[in-house]
């Protein structure tokens, strides 16, 4: 177990014994079979995508096609930001002709993007949200990318990607990249959760924290209380509870990755419940909530839709949505207890 202190890398270590992301992944893979060694190269490509996106974001306001909307809507019916398009294309570009992945599936695309020349040898699928919280770009707040890796289980000759419609325990790796004051990559391949900070002078992600453990309980509750009257009564009951009791503080940035990173480091709970308008929630299971659930569970936390463990949910379509309750074990259980209690009272 490690204490979740702020990231700090001694200056002298950068010259001598720093651990880069690629080196760390290779060390993690020593206990894996030889078939899994491609994960190191895949993680390096994800890191490259993160570097390219971070560079673009650093020039927001100084160059065209970074801020604002494209005027189009995506498969979710949402207005598309210019950075959404750029980031999605970056992920596709860095994996083309890599021989590593056969498919890329993104919340920005109706169907997976196939790379035929990779398919004979690329045994993996990359699932990702290229830019989470893209509305924050125009006001210079943090945004992020979310990713997960799954092993392809059939030839998918009809292009329907049915093998992706399985629970989140089929993920073999997951993580996120947070673009803020520094660019941070957090990942897990099922051997703990590890964080890396991008050193711009080296162009490398450097290990900052290893084997991160989320506190069992934390002071943070993170949710958009502007939706209060659209929530189920159980979630309103929970919100009233934290308002009445000392020791809780609200933090919400509008970027899922930023809020989850705070919860991971400081403890607490993030909630994105269903609403009257969207009872199934807004967040996508295979691109957002399942990858984050994989990561948080690896850190000793808990994630559910309020009733069912998120990693046990089987979607019936690629863009399946789900509510999200995620964070410290005690805090997630508290939210779940309000939901269970309300359901019990409704049945009586």
Curated annotation (Swiss-Prot):
Pathway: Carbohydrate biosynthesis; Calvin cycle. Its cofactor is Mg(2+). GO terms for cellular component: cytosol. Belongs to the FBPase class 1 family. The keyword Transferase does not apply. It comes from Microcystis aeruginosa (strain NIES-843 / IAM M-2473). It comes from the Bacteria. InterPro entries: FBPase_C_dom, FBPase_class-1, FBPase_N, FBPtase, Fructose_bisphosphatase_AS. Its EC number is 3.1.3.11. The gene is fbp. It catalyses: beta-D-fructose 1,6-bisphosphate + H2O = beta-D-fructose 6-phosphate + phosphate. It is found in: Cytoplasm. GO terms for molecular function: fructose 1,6-bisphosphate 1-phosphatase activity; magnesium ion binding. Binds 2 magnesium ions per subunit. Substrate binds at residues 132-135, 224, 252, 282. Keywords: Calvin cycle, Carbohydrate metabolism, Cytoplasm, Hydrolase, Magnesium, Metal-binding. Homotetramer. GO terms for biological process: fructose 1,6-bisphosphate metabolic process; fructose 6-phosphate metabolic process; fructose metabolic process; gluconeogenesis; reductive pentose-phosphate cycle; sucrose biosynthetic process. Mg(2+) 2 binds at residues 129, 132, 288. This is Fructose-1,6-bisphosphatase class 1.
């Amino acid at each position: 177990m490690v204490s979740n202190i702020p990231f700090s890398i001694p200056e002298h270590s950068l010259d001598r014994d720093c651990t880069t992301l690629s080196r760390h992944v290779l060390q993690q893979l020593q206990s894996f079979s030889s078939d899994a060694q491609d994960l190191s190269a895949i993680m390096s490509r994800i890191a490259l995508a993160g570097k390219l996106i971070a560079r673009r974001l650093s020039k927001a306001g100084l160059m065209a096609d970074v801020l604002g909307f494209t005027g189009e809507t995506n498969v979710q019916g949402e207005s598309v930001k210019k950075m959404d398009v750029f980031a999605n294309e970056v992920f596709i570009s860095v994996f083309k002709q890599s021989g590593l992945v056969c498919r890329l599936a993104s919340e920005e695309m109706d169907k997976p993007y196939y790379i035929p020349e990779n398919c004979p040898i690329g045994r993996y699928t990359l699932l990702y949200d290229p830019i989470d919280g893209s509305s924050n770009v125009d006001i210079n707040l943090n945004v992020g990318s979310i990713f997960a890796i799954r092993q392809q289980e059939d030839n998918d000759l009809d292009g329907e990607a049915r093998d992706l419609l399985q629970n989140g325990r089929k993920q073999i790796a997951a993580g996120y990249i947070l673009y803020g004051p520094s660019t941070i990559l957090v990942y897990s391949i099922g051997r703990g959760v590890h964080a890396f900070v991008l050193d711009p002078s080296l162009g490398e992600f450097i290990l900052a924290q290893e084997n991160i453990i989320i506190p069992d309980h934390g002071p943070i509750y993170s949710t958009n209380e502007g939706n209060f009257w659209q929530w189920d009564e159980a979630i309103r009951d929970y919100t009233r509870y934290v308002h009445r009791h000392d020791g809780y503080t609200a933090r919400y940035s509008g970027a899922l990755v930023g809020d989850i990173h705070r919860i991971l480091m400081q403890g607490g709970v993030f909630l994105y419940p269903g609403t009257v308008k969207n009872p199934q929630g807004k967040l996508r299971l295979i691109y957002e909530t399942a990858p984050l659930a994989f990561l948080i569970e690896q850190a000793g936390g808990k994630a559910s839709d309020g009733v069912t463990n998120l990693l046990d949910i089987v979607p019936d379509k690629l863009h399946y949505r789900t509510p999200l309750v995620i964070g410290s074990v005690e805090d997630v259980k508290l939210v779940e207890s309000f939901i269970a209690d309300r359901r019990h009272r409704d049945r009586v």
